[in-house]
Amino acid sequence: MKKKLGTSFIKLFAILVLSLLLTSGAKAGCDDAPTDGVDYSNCQFSEGQDLSRAYIPNSNLSFISFIKVTFDKGVMMNATLANGNFVESSFIRTNLYEANLEGGIFEKANFSSANLTRVNFKGASLIETNFTNSNLFEADLTGANILNATFEGANLNNAVWID
């Protein structure tokens, strides 16, 4: 009887622990579908993925590698893309309102017609980045490397450029 009771207790305990882990809001895995608040920090994704129209506001994409990935027409408001590698990625008409892109590498990225209102680009690498017709109202570009970037038709009202 003692052995049976002990085994039942262990099974019950295991079920309880497993259910707590599943309902605790644990960090998302790198294979999880894009959604609001997902945490992909430190994940590596294959080159050339198409994540157009992805809805990932409030998500953590920091310390991530997304080389040549398409995020066109996506929603990434309040997302964190800090210290990520987004070389040659496309953000055409993407909504990045108040996103944190601090220290990220966005060389040759395309932000044409993107909403970059109040975006934090502090210390980011923006070499040959395309901001044509984008909205950079109150964006913070302090200390960013902005070599040969294109700002034709962009709204730069109240943007911060201090080194």
Could you describe each region identified by the protein language model?
Residues 27-163:
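Tandem repeat scaffolds
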Residues 2-14:
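Bacterial N-terminal signal peptides that target proteins for export
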Residues 11-23:
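Bacterial N-terminal signal peptides
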